[in-house]
Amino acid sequence: NVFQEGAASLLGEDDYEFVGPLPPSAFSEEDRILYDLIAKFESAGSYDAVNVLWYPSGKGGGAFEISSDLNATFEGSKISELSFGKIKKLQSTYFTVRYPKTKPANSFFAMGKFQVIPKTMRLVRANMDFSDSDIYSPENQDRIIEFLIYSGKKRKKLSNYLLNVGSTTLDQAQIDLAQEFSSVPQPNGSSYYGNETSHHSSETIRTALKNARDANKKNGRTSY
């Protein structure tokens, strides 16, 4: 697999473990490396990963409890087999009670390979063409990460940097990415979120961002 060989070259053979399928797509090798770097510590690369959060203090930004499952199912179906309508229902608890004090039943907070949270999923549904009956499949999850990284609907500095638009710096793009994914470090190596820990080295992320930007420039890509 050319992409896996490229990732191994970037990170070192023993530092990169692919989990789950890599569905075919039009992603460049450089984009795929970036996306799987993000997924490595968000979900171990599993399209069926979920997190459930609750806050004993009832407030955000402080201590929280988390329950994680890399191969979650609901009513006998894998997460990647559920409809977007079902996903919406499973995440709806967090719109009713954003900071539940106890673990909410039949609810998930972050879902899938890229750990899409309720607020982000709402943005996705408002801007992409998914219906309630469409499936949260590996292919559609990959479409979502492409949207989040490149559309500029949520992280404009990140998309501008990758598409060589304007004067956005690498530091600004990395901070944007760190705001979206807590496992991604800021330029100084720390997580953007004080109550969480980044897992990647800053240099690894910066290399992946620069490589994706250079590939887009070489290929003449300037838009989502």
Residue ranges: model-predicted function:
Residues V2-I135, N140-Y224:
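Cell-wall polysaccharide-cleaving catalytic domain and substrate-binding groove, primarily
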